[in-house]
Amino acid sequence: MPVIDVQVHPFDRNHPGRPWASPSHGLDSATGEEMVAAMNRVGVDGAIMVSSFSAYEYDPSYALEVYNTYPDKFRVVTPVDATNPAIDDVVAKWAATPGARGIRIRMRDGLPMDADHPGLNRAFAAAAKHGLPVNLLCWGILDKGLPHIQRHRDTVIVIDHLGLLQPARPPVPADVWADLPKLLALAFDPPLCVTAPLPLW
């Protein structure tokens, strides 16, 4: 059975040709070549690349570059902007992109979170229409994500990071497991999935 890492974030070193949108969490790079070497060392056969928002925001071109170099190793999930009036077309175009396997919706201060937000509803619906799972980042605010899960039953939703807040650096949150019972209550509620990456601290 192939071993697949369900969430890696590729990014090149910060340079004028591909500048970062914000500082790295610690690594100078996580290139395709570096990731393939690391995967080979531990017996991982393939990975789902979630384009790094901190490095490239809504631009998945670096992840696609890595996919095009290693099409037998990777598939790509791109962040999408639910405030974009053309979100339906964005998702449709992404679904037709070689290597595309999902979209990511981030929920946090400054971004839409409300269950009645039209852009969010259109993004979830478009993903279902085109057969794309939605990686939903709602860590630390799982209660904000639950209404979307309940509303969009036709969409495969993947809760990133178990829905638990995992800051890039210490200190560890005082009650990091507080929302786990809420997540476990959804365990038998298909088509929900979760990712469980290692904490960064």
Q: What is each model feature region?
A:
Residues M1-R122, A126, H130, L186:
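Mid-domain alpha/beta scaffold segments of enzyme catalytic cores
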Residues D114-W201:
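Catalytic pocket-lining loop regions of alpha/beta-barrel enzymes
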